[in-house]
Amino acid sequence: KYETFDDPAKVMAYIRAEGKYPVVIKADGLALGKGVLICQNEQEAADGVKEIMLDKKFGASGNHVVVEEFLTGPEVSVLSFCDGKTVKPMVSSMDHKRALDHDEGLNTGGMGTVAPNPYYTPAVADRCMKEIFLPTVAAMQAEDCPFKGCLYFGLMLTPDGPKVIEYNCRFGDPETQVVLPLLESDLLTVMQATTNGTLDKTEVKFSDGAAACVILASGGYPLAYEKGKEITGLTEGQLDAADVTVYHAGTAIKEGKLVTN
């Protein structure tokens, strides 16, 4: 259940009328994965609405907000290749969003991921394909707006079954870092098939292995974080495991040193 608003007063009137907490408030636009607030009471909701809609923390993305009922259950990220008529899901993953250990702290763009998602069983995958993935692609076709590219399904496995939390028309970060290393098919071939509309004739195969991603973030993240701090321990000779890959974002080389940026 959800409602959208462009008036802060109407947001709070709706939340008070519903009277259910926690309640979820989302900036209806791009916010670097940080535009979702889970509010435990009316004061937190009021503070969140002010932050998003009045203080414009996320700029124009906060002109509208979505207020959603709070759902419980394991979260699942399923990236998929879609050529407008055929959808082929990639291996599932689980994103850990909280900044601190033990699922504590602020929501972030993601502090780590694992793939495959242990809660996403073959039975759940079949249900999602029938009830969510295929109907989504068919609906876009019916609106004469077929989608080609990476279609990202953000799901929650609730006691009432899988629910869609969000769609993204892009690869996920940090989900991609654990999903694509498990892809055994040639990525370029799959992407060409996605573009050409021939996914139904193209094999998309993933290994039976697993992958994990851990985010190393500068102090203060996801709020004001420290910049210019030296990062050590990431050179090839300093990494113990041969199968470790380091991906960079928000870093720079200054005076020959790797620093946060």
Residues covered by each model-derived region:
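Internal nucleotide-binding/catalytic subdomain
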Residues: G35-V178
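Residue-level signal for inorganic ion chemistry
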Residues: K26, G109, V214
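A short linear hydrophobic-aromatic micro-motif
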Residues: P22-I25, N63-V66, D200-T202, G256
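Active-site "cap" helix and flanking loop/linker of ATP-utilizing ligase/carboxylase catalytic domains
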Residues: M129-L151, N168-A241, A249-E255
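A conserved helix-loop-beta module that forms one wall/lid of the active-site cleft
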Residues: K1-G35
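Short, intrinsically disordered, charge-balanced linker/junction segments flanking boundaries
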Residues: E255-N261
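Hydrophobic side chains in beta-strands
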Residues: S80, L157, L216-A217, H248
